[in-house]
Structure formats: C-alpha cells, structure tokens
Amino acid sequence: MNSLVKLLARSPLLTPDLDHYLVRAALVIIFVLFGYQKWFEYEARVLIPYISHGPLVFWLYPVFGIRGASWFLGVVEWLVGVLLFIGFWNRTSGLLGAVGSIITFLSTVTIIPFMPNAWDATAGGFPAIAADTTAFLIKDLVLLAASVYLLKEDALRLSGAERPTSAFTILVRTLGRSGLFAKDLDYSLLRGSMVIVFFFFGYTKWHEYGARAMVPFISHGPLLFWLYPAFGFRGAARFLGAFEWFTAMLLFSGFWNSRLGILGAIASVLTFVSTLTIIPFIPDGWAASAGGFPAMAGPVAFLMKDVVLLAVSIYLLKQDVERAQVPAIGQERMPHIARTLESGERTG
C-alpha cells in the first residue's frame, strides 16, 4: 500500500487545483448539455413529471406553461454554466454560479420524495430506486455536494483577495458564519454522497428489473461487454452490484482510514470511466427529433452525470493520497483570512 501511495504521489494527481478544475469543468459540461435540451419539445415533455411533483419548481407551469417552463430552465442552466465557466478566472462569477448550481440540485433532489413510483414495486419498494426516475435524480446528491465544494473554494479565494468588494465581503462573511468554512465540510459531503449513490445503485443490481435496465449499457460498453459471456445476464448485474457495494464500503471507511479511501476512490474512478465510455457506442443516445448531438436522449442523459462523479472520484483520490502522506490527517487548508470571518475581523 505504501508503494501505491508513493506512486500516486509522484503522478500528476497532486497537481495544485487539479481536482478543483475538474469538478468545475464537469459541472459546466452538465449545465451546457442539459440546458441545451430544454429548448426542444421532447425534453419539455420529459420534464412534466419532474416539474409537476417538484416542491421547489411546481410553480413553473402556472407561470410559464409547459414549453415556457422548459425554456426558463434552459436559460437558468446556461446562465449557471456560463458563471461557473467564468469562475475559472473570476471567483465572484464562480461563487454566483455555485449558488445557482446549489439551488438547481436542491430543486431536483427534493423531487424524489414526491415522485410517483419513485421506488420499484417489483423489488419491494424502497430502497430499490426506479430505473427511469429516481435513478436519474439520485446522482444529483453528488452534483449538489460538488456545488457546495465549489462555493466553499470560491468563497475562500474571494476572502483572500486584496480588495474584495464590500458586497461580496459581507456575503463571504455570511457564508462563513453559516458553517460553510467548517473543516472538511465539502470533503465529507462529497464522500457521503458518493457512498449513498454506490449503495443505491448496487442494491438495484440484485433485482430482475435492475438487471434488465443494465442490458443496453453492458452490451455496448467497451469496458463492460465481457461481463455477459463471463457471468450471464443475472450474474453480470450481481457482479456489478457486489463491486459497487464493495466500493461504497471502501469509500465509507475512508472517513477514518485514508488508505482504504484511496482504494475506494480508485474503484470509483474505474466505475465511471467504464460508464462514460459507453456514451459513444450506445444506440439512440442523441435525440433525433432535435437534430442529434448535442441533444441528449434518455440513456446518454443518465450517463452524462457521471462526468461529475468521475471528477469527484479524482478529488477524493487526491485528498486521500495527501492525507495518507501527512500524519496530521485533514490539516486545516483554510487561509487565515477565512478563519477570522466568524470573529467579524475586517479583511482585505
């Protein structure tokens, strides 16, 4: 294990801000692609059950109508994507984009308790996530945690600016008092959300409906197709379920043992590399009614969120490699100027 840690430490993995840039870029991709499909009729129809049962978005239909609600969301998502992209250079824009991203994924995650047929009845209901609804939404837990991570990073960098604007000084101080700057908050949220995702998706693989839902993905996966010849229809799903639960346990153990966390993060990286490489090969991945690429159809829209989950896996891997090298695990990374916010000391 020591050799693995040293090997990873010598790799580009520990490049400063690599994880930050990957998470930011992944969220930009998500907002651009999902925003794009909101302009088409097929996506407006797909959104109906989500908006209708969303406690934070149900008002969109009375205000804008079916197509108007979809267009409104498209504008918002593109705006958030642009702000996050500008955040590579301008932390103020990045902070605003992160706030918009948090609101977006709070809106989607809160749909889950109210969505009809959110849990598969053939598998006994909860915690068997329905393949066509909850499975799509549950990944947003990780996207929400990633948004909190970016908000914290941008707030800390803004707080260290030489001349922050007064308005944003107040905003950053408010965020500091809210507990956003708590040590390892973002790290814990990202790790916890990944554990939840692996648990739920691993659970579905042990049931018939989950095995059937996997057929197009495994059949067209360049890194997964061998599972059917090796294990058969149900065996392939069970193999993946066991692997996903094993990954979840390693990631969960990473809260206390960074070396186990490294193994979990590596398994997570392998998982999402395997799923993302399906995208170029899966049939009907792009909506023909909207002209094809970049208008995502159901299977690609489901897989595309794994861009963020892969970036988060790399973040966790980097964090655990750093912690495995340092005896004082989880040393405070917060600048002094951020630590003084709660005391009300004026900075800048």
Regions found by a protein language model. Give the residues of each.
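Membrane-interface extramembranous regions
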Residues: M1-G348
